[in-house]
UniProtKB/Swiss-Prot annotation:
<comment type="similarity">
    <text>Belongs to the universal ribosomal protein uL6 family.</text>
</comment>
<dbReference type="GO" id="GO:0019843">
    <property type="term" value="F:rRNA binding"/>
</dbReference>
<dbReference type="InterPro" id="IPR000702">
    <property type="entry name" value="Ribosomal_uL6-like"/>
</dbReference>
<dbReference type="GO" id="GO:0022625">
    <property type="term" value="C:cytosolic large ribosomal subunit"/>
</dbReference>
<dbReference type="Pfam" id="PF00347">
    <property type="entry name" value="Ribosomal_L6"/>
</dbReference>
<dbReference type="InterPro" id="IPR020040">
    <property type="entry name" value="Ribosomal_uL6_a/b-dom"/>
</dbReference>
<keyword id="KW-0687">Ribonucleoprotein</keyword>
<keyword id="KW-0689">Ribosomal protein</keyword>
<dbReference type="InterPro" id="IPR036789">
    <property type="entry name" value="Ribosomal_uL6-like_a/b-dom_sf"/>
</dbReference>
<dbReference type="GO" id="GO:0002181">
    <property type="term" value="P:cytoplasmic translation"/>
</dbReference>
<protein>
    <recommendedName>
        <fullName>Large ribosomal subunit protein uL6</fullName>
    </recommendedName>
</protein>
<dbReference type="GO" id="GO:0003735">
    <property type="term" value="F:structural constituent of ribosome"/>
</dbReference>
<dbReference type="InterPro" id="IPR002359">
    <property type="entry name" value="Ribosomal_uL6_CS2"/>
</dbReference>
Amino acid sequence: MKTILASETMEIPEGVTVQVAAKVVTVEGPRGKLTRNFKHLNLDFQLLEGGRKLQVDAWFGTRRTMAAIRTAISHVQNLITGVTKGYRYKMRFVYAHFPINASITNSNTAIEIRNFLGEKKVRKVDMLEGVTILRSEKVKDELVLDGNDIELVSRSAALINQKCHVKNKDIRKFLDGIYVSDKGTITEDA
């Protein structure tokens, strides 16, 4: 069965401007500017009330198109959170015997991992565009990844995690690696 028209609206907070041009949504806020392309979705985007509300419509949509409405709104909310608060992922080093040695290079945009499982090989991971990496000052063996785009921050964390993958061993026993321990925003809610 097809629904004739399904729509959902979302509020746009103060201090954030949203522009829509041919299914490309641009969100600008105090932390910067993010753009997302929704051309692959069969949806209509329009701004209401002088740019204070965003409405997403689906005409004659199937179940999959109806689900895409909420997905698109969630993506735009992630963009708004990114340009207002920013995203922060924390990663911890886990090792049983050989301490993992990590050094941050390229002005906080790359990390070199040494002594993983006692190996001599140096593993280098470049962060994706707009993501910075720091060693935590308060907690030992912790990395902090900061950025505005949640997808780039989480993918950078995944790249670090995958570089420290234990091969040819039982991963239930060899738990060494760098794992995500906390996900949140840079500016905490008061």
